[in-house]
């Protein structure tokens, strides 16, 4: 995490994990979020115009939640289409 590069935000009203990075060609943002029945991923230039329906579908789902916890942990909770709740944590390096 480069000084706030990982955050929780909203994208068209959808809760999303946002990961920002600076490349030679500019600043880019990656969003992981739930929209219209799917967990989605969207990678865009920070100067682009985009919407939640622009993201690539990853897996079918019925709900998604993300939270940044202490000790550099991100908590993901995904409810699948069978209404089974799956929770996992991802650690990141500061």
Language model features with spans:
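Type IV pilin-like appendage domain
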Residues: 13, 17-73
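Low-complexity, S/T/G/P-rich flexible repeat/linker segments used as non-globular hinges
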Residues: 68-94
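Membrane-proximal N-terminal amphipathic helix
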Residues: 1-10
């Amino acid at each position: 995490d480069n000084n706030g590069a990982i955050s929780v935000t909203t994208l068209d009203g959808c809760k999303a994990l946002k990961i920002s990075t600076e490349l030679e060609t500019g600043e880019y943002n990656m969003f992981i979020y739930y929209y219209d029945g799917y967990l989605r991923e969207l990678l865009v230039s920070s100067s682009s115009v985009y919407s939640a329906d622009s993201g690539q579908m990853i897996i079918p789902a019925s709900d998604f939640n993300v939270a940044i916890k202490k000790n550099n942990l991100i908590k993901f909770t995904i409810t699948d289409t069978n209404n089974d709740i799956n929770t996992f944590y991802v650690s990141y390096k500061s």
